[in-house]
A protein has these predicted regions:
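Amphipathic alpha-helical dimerization/coiled-coil segments
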Residues: 1-9, 79-109
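N-terminal helix-turn-helix DNA-binding core of bacterial DNA-binding proteins
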Residues: 2, 8-46, 68-81
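Solvent-exposed, charged/polar functional surfaces in cytosolic regulatory/catalytic domains
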Residues: 20, 57, 87, 91
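Alpha-helical residues within the helix-turn-helix
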Residues: 41, 58-59
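Residues within the DNA-recognition helix of helix-turn-helix
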Residues: 53
Length: 109
């Protein structure tokens, strides 16, 4: 097994967040686990596109696939990811002057 540095781990996390669809997907999974078809509809993405993003997030270790019979449910790999996303989102909304002021109350943006 290859050992990675803290910088490499953070770079992988940054790569996961660098795409708006992946970021929205992580935020959706922060709320609840989901199935690919439902997540694609929620995000307005094609199933193929969503599948590619889920593969990326799995490769980064942020998301896991849980087989359920003939379906697969996706969820965050660790509860700490949810807390990290909450903290990161709160920080970014606090310091970014372009952030939507209604995001925290309305769950938009």
């Amino acid at each position: 097994m290859e050992t990675v540095t803290h910088g490499q781990v953070l770079a992988r996390f940054g790569h996961a967040l660098s795409d708006a669809t992946r970021s929205r997907l992580l935020l959706a999974l922060r709320e609840a686990p989901g199935y690919p078809a439902e997540l694609a509809d929620l995000l307005g993405a094609t199933r193929q596109n969503l599948s590619n993003h889920l593969a990326c997030l799995r490769g980064c270790g942020l998301v896991v696939a849980v087989p359920e019979g003939r379906r697969t449910r996706y969820e965050l790999a660790d509860i700490r990811i949810r807390h990290a996303l909450d903290d990161l989102l709160g920080l970014v909304l606090a310091v970014d002057p372009a952030a939507c002021p209604d995001a925290a109350e309305n769950g938009c943006c």
